[in-house]
Regions:
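Charged DNA-binding/catalytic regions of mobile-element recombinases
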Residues: 1-258
């Protein structure tokens, strides 16, 4: 029970039974195999539980459908390799100093957050900086971006000329949701919802001191959360491994096939 509580507290106090079970059985904690029913019983006894997600809301103005590229995803968010499909979206965070906005770019295959940015306005630079971070990371890793599909909603930030130029320079193909609802970009919306539940509105997390103060605090804590999400948080869609572990597996497989 002591180990289980420590794991829960060291991981933003967000693990429910499924993630706790996956974590205990994939990390070197010296506890051996732990049955799911045992995890459930002990968590109930300790009074600890996972967080509940809120449904994310759209915050960006939409470009007209006729001014957007085709929807190449059609709500099928699957990818067999890295850089096959990226999704991008923007969410908002209330602070005592006013609203701040957060942009993410995620690789669908590994679920890894490749780029992110926090800003005080919804200008194009918010989304563009997140995209450039993702592109730079792939270049450092020597992973080819040619032919990748970049999917987003119809937010005007993603239809800006500079954003299109950045995609063209890395030989990426733009895709935009066709109907304009949240299901058009469901995987990115799901990440926003996780971010809100596990960090922004999580009053149980260690270090919680009340409402967010300002952009600087959100930026600092978002950086820490993204690192944790990529390297420590088991993802059930990945079989209980982390996004970084999924990336490592794909990289190893690619090298063996070369």
């Amino acid at each position: 029970m002591r180990v289980m509580r420590q794991v829960w507290e060291e991981n933003y106090c967000v693990f429910g039974v499924r993630k706790m079970h996956a974590f205990l059985n994939t990390h070197e904690l010296g506890v051996g195999h732990v049955a799911r029913c045992t995890v459930e019983r002990l968590m109930r006894r300790m009074g600890i539980r996972g967080v509940s997600r809120r449904r994310a809301r759209h915050v960006t103005a939409s470009a007209p459908r006729h001014a957007c590229p085709l929807d190449l995803v059609n709500r099928h968010f699957g990818a067999h390799d890295l850089n096959e499909l990226w999704v991008a979206d923007i969410t908002y965070v209330p602070t005592q100093a006013g609203w701040v906005y957060v942009a993410f770019v995620t690789d669908v295959c590994s679920r890894k957050i490749l780029g992110w940015k926090v800003a005080s306005s919804l200008r194009t630079d918010l989304a563009l900086d997140a995209l450039n971070m993702a592109i730079c990371q792939r270049r450092r890793e020597n992973i080819d971006t040619r032919g990748l599909v970049h999917h987003s909603d119809r937010g005007v930030q993603y239809r800006d000329v500079r954003y299109g130029q950045a995609l063209a320079q890395c030989k990426a193909i733009a895709s935009v949701g066709s109907t304009g609802d949240s299901y058009d970009n469901a995987l990115a919306e799901a990440l926003n919802s996780l971010y809100k539940a596990e960090l922004i509105y999580n009053t149980a997390r260690p270090g919680y001191t009340g409402p967010w103060r300002d952009q600087r605090e959100v930026e600092r804590e978002t950086s820490a959360w993204v690192h944790w999400y990529n390297t420590s948080r088991p993802h059930l869609a990945l079989g209980g491994i982390t996004p970084q572990q999924a990336e490592n597996k794909h990289t190893t497989t690619r090298k063996k096939a070369a």
